[in-house]
A protein has these predicted regions:
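Nucleotide-activated donor-binding/catalytic signature segment of Leloir-type glycosyltransferases, i.e.
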Residues: 160-177
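Short glycine-rich, flexible loops that bind phosphorylated cofactors or substrates
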Residues: 15-17, 113, 159, 200-201
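A short, gly/pro- and small-residue-rich
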Residues: 19-42, 123-132, 207-219
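A donor-sugar binding/catalytic signature common to diverse glycosyltransferases
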Residues: 179-220
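Structural motif
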Residues: 6, 35, 60, 103, ...
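Conserved catalytic-core segment of nucleotide-activated headgroup transferases in glycan assembly
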Residues: 89-165
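Structural alpha-helical scaffold elements that stabilize or flank donor/cofactor-binding regions
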Residues: 29, 54, 142, 184-185
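Active-site and donor-binding regions of nucleotide-sugar-utilizing enzymes
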Residues: 1-94
Length: 220
């Protein structure tokens, strides 16, 4: 890691053996000598001060949308050559997407590395609200009436607790990265339900409707 000429990845501290550890080491000036290329894995939609130049070092900061590029260029404090508007490869297939099934895709976002896991996860508002949705009788009836199905795909970092969710209907399935390709789900769905995930940009790009289910907006 420390000997590489280039470190290229979709997360900060790309290729680090331990992302959190090496992030803190970099903050103390202990950085790999290779050029840092941040590809990103979505469009930035929030204030992310920890990505500003005063807190993070990058040699190339890839931007996926022009307004995002202008925002990063004007507010993040990097030299002008660092942020570059070149687009994200994840959008390339979306241009050719023509499929649309009678499927509702539910994709809530990550809740942070300190969010409860294991049995404690069952006591969180996240679990309670989405489990309630998955077992909602009115929703089951609506899916049956309209001949739709619902697919629940939690953020990849939350999927370690996916097995704790239960479906109340054969029209509602709980899936993961092991069984489904997330981009195919985005291309196939007729509608997206999310809380705060920037994946809504992908669905908006496809000109499909988005419903926001933000039960903890004041806390998140």
């Amino acid at each position: 890691y420390y000997c590489a000429d280039f470190l290229i990845g979709t997360h900060v501290q790309p290729c680090a053996p331990d992302l959190i550890l090496f992030y803190h080491l970099a903050g103390k000036g202990i950085r790999a000598r290779g050029k840092q290329v941040f590809l990103q894995h979505g469009i930035i939609k929030d204030e992310m001060e920890w990505l500003h130049r005063k807190n993070m070092y990058m040699d190339l900061f890839v931007c996926g949308a022009k307004p995002e590029y202008e925002y990063i260029r004007d507010t993040f404090g990097y030299p002008e050559h660092v942020p570059q508007y070149v687009g994200l490869a994840r959008f390339d297939n979306l241009i050719r997407a023509e499929r649309k099934e009678k499927m509702i895709l539910v994709m809530p976002t990550w809740r942070g590395s300190h969010y409860p896991t294991g049995e404690a996860f069952r006591k969180t508002a996240y679990y309670e609200h989405f489990q309630s949705l998955l077992c909602c009788k009115e929703l089951e009836q609506l899916l049956e009436q309209q001949d739709y199905r619902l697919v629940f795909y939690p953020h990849i970092e939350m999927q370690k607790d996916s097995r704790r969710f239960k479906s109340g209907s054969d029209r509602i399935t709980i899936v993961s990265k092991e069984t489904h390709d997330v981009q195919k789900l985005l291309m196939d769905c007729a509608l997206l339900v999310t809380d705060y995930s920037s994946v809504f940009f992908d669905v908006a790009f496809l000109r499909k409707p988005v419903v926001y289910y933000q039960f903890d907006e004041e806390e998140f």
